[in-house]
Amino acid sequence: LKNILLPTDFSDNSWNAIKYAISLYKEEKCVFYILNTYTPTIAHSRFMAISDHEKMSKDIVRANSEKGLMNLVWKIKSKYKNEHHSFVTISSFNLLVDEVKNIIETKEIDLVVAGTKGASQIEEVFMGSNIVRMIKSIKNCPVLAIPSNFKFKRPSEIAFATDFNRFYTESELRPLIEMARSFQATIRIVHVQYEIKALTEVQQFNLGMLRKYLGTLPHYVHTVSELNSVSKTLEVFANELDIHLLAMLHYPHSYMEKMTREPIVNRLAFHTQIPLLVIPELGMNASCYSVKKETSENPSRTLKK
């Protein structure tokens, strides 16, 4: 049983991410937690009394949130009739990232799947501010970011971007390995270098351990020269090899951190055209995945906060 968190702002982009997640796990038993957060714009100091009008405003926004979630579940069930899937809706008066982190802990979430941009995000940015904050803040769960117009493709070609400067633990690689096994995928290990040169002893050791963890999974190593920026280089690589999903770890000085810090002019062309799986840094003893009890329950309810 997998627990998948689907944040939504009811935009087309978030709907596309939901469709991707449901298609990705159509053969697996899953509970999908669909989250909508709302924070009404109320201009008052935290020390001032809240007027009846402000309370009414919050009630209206909460009602709209709950109604939107109810309609969304109806839409999903009408389009995807899958007995393996159940849905729990969560309407919360909270900041999105704070609520996502809370739900990951309390619901033992395996994966967060979210759209790259919200309802008001412009197209020219690398990723929307919410998804970037989510990736930077979440320390114990992978995040799968889905582009606005990406149509689901079975991820049979997965790229894993790494510079081999860091030792990866088995727990950190587990989301990548499980994804590859589920879809009999080939893993393309891609190393972007500013100028091509031989690997250091440390890099060779880390590559050897990476290959050991991947075991019998088909995988290849590709070393490519940087083109203007890491993001542009990975985009070209993904297009040329018809990559269906790009995975990377997020830690200090990682490719993911470099991409979010690149000057905007270097990121204009990178529209996250394929799904991006971002795995958090866990260390030696941590794990994204908790042991869960199998249950025959079929939760379909709305949680209020």
Report residues per predicted region.
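Short secondary-structure boundary segments
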Residues: T116, H191, L249-Y251, P280-E281
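Charged helix-capping and loop-helix junction motifs
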Residues: M127-I131, Q203-L207, T260-V265
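Short, structured interface segments
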Residues: I131-K151
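Structural beta-alpha unit
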Residues: W74-V112, G215-N266, I274, G283-K293, ...
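Short beta-strand elements of ligand-binding domains
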Residues: V113-T116, P142-S148, L276-P280
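Small/aliphatic-rich secondary-structure junction motif
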Residues: L1-K55, E157-T223, I243, H271, ...
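A short acidic, glycine-rich active-site loop
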Residues: H53-K67
